[in-house]
Amino acid sequence: MRRILFIILSSALFFIGNIHAQVATSDSLVMHYLQQQGIPVTANNEVKLLMSGREKFLDLFEEIRHAKHHIHLEYFNFRNDSIANALFDLLAVKVQEGVEVRALFDAFGNWSNNKPLKKHHLKAIRDRGIEIVKFDPITFPWINHAMHRDHRKIVVIDGKIGYTGGMNIADYYITGRPKIGQWHDMHMRIEGDAVRYLQGIFLTMWNQETKQHVGGPVYFPDIPQLPDSIAEEIAIVDRTPRETPR
């Protein structure tokens, strides 16, 4: 029996599913769609599901501490709270160690949450050597491209470890919210060939928004072959804000 982890990175939604196909043939709706769209399935991956905010942030922060070359982050929003502050503190330490740090966030996602990053927050972050860029700034009084925002949640560390899932950067994924209670969401850590696709998605958006030309082999290192006993197949479907048809 073949298992494919089918990940959609959408500007409108995030969906993750485990698909257990009875027969792994082109008759499978999933395989047919992937083939039709020319979306590759990578087989050399190890996946760890992170079933709570606490699991996600403990795992993410630990891997950031071990980063050697670069850390790339792309989120709908970084809520200006204790988790985000701890994250930026840690990222600033890594900058001092010589690690490149780049972060993208959606302008509407930032504006629409109740603890946004304001101009003075962004200046303080940049003053610490962290490159942070706003995707598609809002043009008041209009909310431009309201249905085509960047809802991705991606982290790539040294081109080898990737994170994606349902959680932005906010402390309520751990503490809950007064009117809602405990927050239930999930995330995942990926090691393997699929990380190259997450990296490509991030760098395409980064270069588009900054007019930089970040790229090259150092961001796409060779990935060791994993034992068949732990290797998972992953397909990543990306919907680019303002570009990909519905």
Residue ranges of predicted features:
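Bacterial Sec-dependent N-terminal signal peptides
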Residues: 1-26
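Charged, low-complexity intrinsically disordered terminal segments
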Residues: 18-246
